[in-house]
């Protein structure tokens, strides 16, 4: 089965990068309640206002339920001045994936 991965870029408004990071870090785990298999929140090292929320689902309908669900809708309303609009996501088929296990000490530091 080819899973789908949603990429949703955010661009924080002036001086709101840390606030947006906290909001996305709080929101992302909620995707698991909607059937997500994995989520990641990325913050650019080159441009600290640039973020990407990446969430993997088996079905696009699960993403739709999460995106239009109560928690995500409330986050968008409460934080609407913290990021540039519109929010435009794209749905991707995951056609290949590889991963090396991280050193356990490093994983603990990142958690």
Q: For each predicted feature, which ranges?
A:
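Short S/T/G/P-rich N-terminal loop/turn motif that feeds into the first structured element of a domain
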Residues: 1-51, 58-70, 85-111
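Outer-membrane beta-barrel domain signature
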Residues: 72-81
């Amino acid at each position: 089965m080819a899973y789908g991965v949603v990429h949703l870029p955010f661009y924080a408004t002036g001086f709101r990068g840390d606030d947006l990071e906290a909001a996305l870090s709080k929101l992302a785990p909620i995707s698991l309640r909607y059937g997500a298999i994995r989520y990641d929140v990325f913050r650019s090292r080159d441009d600290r206002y640039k973020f990407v929320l990446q969430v993997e689902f088996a079905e696009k309908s699960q993403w739709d339920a999460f995106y239009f669900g109560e928690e995500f809708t409330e986050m968008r309303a409460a934080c609407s001045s913290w990021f540039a609009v519109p929010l435009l996501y794209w749905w991707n088929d995951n056609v290949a994936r590889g991963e090396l296990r991280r050193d356990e000490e490093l994983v603990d530091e990142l958690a």
